[in-house]
Amino acid sequence: MQQPLNYPYPQIYWVDSRASSPWGPPGSVLPCPSSVPGRPGQRRPPPPPPPTLPPPPPPPPLPPLPLPPLKTRRDHNTGLCLLVMFFMVLVALVGLGLGMFQLFHLQKELAELRESTSQKHVASSLEKQIGQLNPPSEKRELRKVAHLTGKPNSRSIPLEWEDTYGIALVSGVKYKKGGLVINDTGMYFVYSKVNFRGQSCNNQPLNHKVYMRNSKYPQDLVLMEGKMMNYCTTGQMWARSSYLGAVFNLTSADHLYVNVSELSLVSFEESKTFFGLYKL
């Protein structure tokens, strides 16, 4: 279909700011002919429409969560190591503190022990110099010792003794029916003294002996014996003493006794007639 030639079209102008036109000043607008040059009666076709832009692409998917930077992980590991080291140092300090406490406690006990040992040494030295004035009662009870004195109403043989009153003493051994009974085997010093006196003198022999009885022996065993003869002057008062003493190895259940030949001539004063022993 042919378009009418007299259809009015707006004129199109090309503008060239860099080229100068011979018909006008530089930068002037040149009219664009509406018809095709060389082809009168035909109009220039309209310019093509601008190209349509494609639709924008969809937004890219969200990227995954990024891993923590290497520096952050290193900082985390460093903090964990520092925490572990702190606890290790704390445990070491606690152990060191406990060790120092135990060492202080041991030093204190050692000082107390040294002080106690020093005091005991000083006390022992003083006891050696001035003697033990007040010995413990336990030591007195454990000491095997006896000192018996004469008994005025003694009328039998062997002699009977006073074991309770006056200066009499019995400890660690037993007094029974005129004799001392040994409870502990060991070495003993045994002694006896008898004082004889008379209004007149007939010079009869005077015997004084200490003997032992034990179920192991069939008869009495004489340990010590003394005999006096010609000890006085006829017709005069007289007094003589007999003393016996020696060390013996005695066993448990041994019984010790004292016998004299003339009981009527014995003076039973506690300072003159006595019988005793003590364990060495």
Curated annotation (Swiss-Prot):
Q: Where is the THD domain?
A: 144-280
Q: How is it modified after translation?
A: The soluble form derives from the membrane form by proteolytic processing. The membrane-bound form undergoes two successive intramembrane proteolytic cleavages. The first one is processed by ADAM10 producing an N-terminal fragment, which lacks the receptor-binding extracellular domain. This ADAM10-processed FasL (FasL APL) remnant form is still membrane anchored and further processed by SPPL2A that liberates the FasL intracellular domain (FasL ICD). FasL shedding by ADAM10 is a prerequisite for subsequent intramembrane cleavage by SPPL2A in T-cells. Phosphorylated by FGR on tyrosine residues; this is required for ubiquitination and subsequent internalization.
Kindly list the cysteine pairs connected by disulfide bridges: C201-C232
Q: Membrane-spanning residues where?
A: 81-101
Q: Which GO terms describe its cellular component?
A: cytoplasmic vesicle lumen; external side of plasma membrane; extracellular exosome; extracellular space; lysosomal lumen; nucleus
- Per the UniProt record, the site (Cleavage) maps to L80, C81, K128, Q129
Question: What GO molecular functions are on record for this protein?
Answer: cytokine activity; tumor necrosis factor receptor binding
Its job: Cytokine that binds to TNFRSF6/FAS, a receptor that transduces the apoptotic signal into cells. Involved in cytotoxic T-cell-mediated apoptosis, natural killer cell-mediated apoptosis and in T-cell development. Initiates fratricidal/suicidal activation-induced cell death (AICD) in antigen-activated T-cells contributing to the termination of immune responses. TNFRSF6/FAS-mediated apoptosis has also a role in the induction of peripheral tolerance. Binds to TNFRSF6B/DcR3, a decoy receptor that blocks apoptosis.
Q: Tell me the protein's name.
A: Tumor necrosis factor ligand superfamily member 6
Organism field: Felis catus (Cat)
**Gene name tied to this protein:** FASLG
